[in-house]
Amino acid sequence: MASTSLSLPSLKLQFPSHTSSSSRKNSSSYRVSIRPIQASVSEIPPYISSPSQSPSSSSSPPVKQAKLPAQKVPGDYGLPLVGPWKDRLDYFYNQGKNEFFKSRIQKHQSTVFRTNMPPGPFISFNPNVVVLLDGKSFPVLFDVSKVEKKDLFTGTFMPSTDLTGGYRVLSYLDPSEPNHAKLKKLMFYLLSSRRNEVIPEFHNSYSELFETLENELSTKGKAGLNAANDQAAFNFLARSLYGINPQDTELGTDGPKLIGKWVLFQLHPLLILGLPKVLEDLVMHTFRLPPALVKKDYQRLYNFFYENSTSVLDEAEKIGISREEACHNLLFATCFNSFGGIKIFFPNMLKWIGRAGAKLHSQLAQEIRSVISSNSGKVTMAAMEKMPLMKSVVYESLRIEPPVASQYGRAKHDMVIESHDASFEIKEGELLYGYQPFATKDPKIFDRSEEFVADRFIGEEGEKLLKHVLWSNGSETENASINNKQCAGKDFVVLVSRLLLVELFLRYDSFEIEVGASPLGAAITLTSLRRASF
């Protein structure tokens, strides 16, 4: 999802071993019990602790680096209207995203250059950007002392606030704006107040997913993952964060479908849907779709969240946020950020693991089952910290195909940005853009950068590379706060991704897939699920 930031609270909290009975009152109708699960942890896991000291802090003196040659940022924007339109056609159709950037790197002999980013006219009238495509220049986009993030969540255009109840939600706020800190605090509160439920509810929701896939495999010989994952993801988020089973409400099973339509009206200028090129470019990339067409769908989602988030809305009023604004933000954080992240990342991660083959599957199954067995059969955060291969696989999946592909920032003042090869002067007000898959596959940082290396982040040397995993609008070794734009749900995303692998390989020895394309992430079809044999 383009420029998506998963705005849910960071898991910097201990998970108590007890479970609140009051939070389970709405969930009896969907409980699935296969094995005991306890949401507990003996200590705060290392992956959410403070960054370790860098190697440069050792006793040996630092090596003085040669001054990089100063260059003018290469490239241009072309003629008004014509240049942005031509770049848009190249980006979507003539070249595609990766070739669009690769060809310009080759043309300019630089990973920093000027171009136009979609959608351009007549949705965005100022699509001019300076592109950053290497791991050295890219991190400036996270430095809020140097760049402003106001209204840049989706890039060179901002969807109508009619799609979010008339409010600019948290993802579009710069940390300098007063409501940013208040709303981010509210997101932290959301998860901390429901921390007991995350691991058990993930188990329940994804056990239902696996049963659905098994039934479809047995009757049809193959099973589509994406739609089933969408339903499981929405059920999990509603149950764990709001204590409600959607199927017991007026919403029923419509949540994912309603979210899909609503997200389409926000992101259509950035998507390819497979329509005839001329028609798609005219309808999807040239003019905005009217928000009124999804008003009723959005109202159904809003009603669901308003009715089932009383305690969080009470907290919002204490912080100084109206219940209405808070609810629109909760909806956005849950449906766009969190649901959208799971929708994209889970299929992408399974694509890479599926392609890696049975040997990796066996190694993961052995590691996961051994640790859980020694932990009395309980899945806990502390237990997952003892699974180095599983953790590395999650980080490698986030590195090689980050769910957040794009980042933007507007220069707050004149500055100098450095790539590996040169330095460039940037003027105040210029819009900076980074395409993250290039930064996280920088061959000057990662060996075999284009390959999926499952054990890349194991051991001391592997852990040093985590600072270059950037999917969360910040480094993996840094933490979200009210003062930055790093994804408030960074650790939540890592946790649920780990849980998916644990649940999968506790249940199955291996799986086989077919991979197709979709507007958001990979389309996965399962052709085989081999039940656990040991």
From Swiss-Prot:
Tissue: Expressed in flowers. Detected in stems and roots, but not in leaves and fruits under non-inducing conditions.
Gene3D superfamilies for the chain: Cytochrome P450
Reactions that this protein is recorded to catalyse: (13S)-hydroperoxy-(9Z,11E,15Z)-octadecatrienoate = (9Z,13S,15Z)-12,13-epoxyoctadeca-9,11,15-trienoate + H2O; (13S)-hydroperoxy-(9Z,11E)-octadecadienoate = (9Z,13S)-12,13-epoxyoctadeca-9,11-dienoate + H2O
Disordered, as annotated region: 1-31, 43-71
One GO BP: oxylipin biosynthetic process
Cell compartment(s), UniProt: Plastid, Chloroplast
MF (Gene Ontology): allene oxide synthase activity; heme binding; iron ion binding; monooxygenase activity; oxidoreductase activity, acting on paired donors, with incorporation or reduction of molecular oxygen
Cofactor(s) this protein cannot do without: heme b
Name of the molecule in the record: Allene oxide synthase 1, chloroplastic
Source organism: Solanum lycopersicum (Tomato)
Native organism taxonomy: Eukaryota, Viridiplantae, Streptophyta, Embryophyta, Tracheophyta
This protein's encoding gene: AOS1
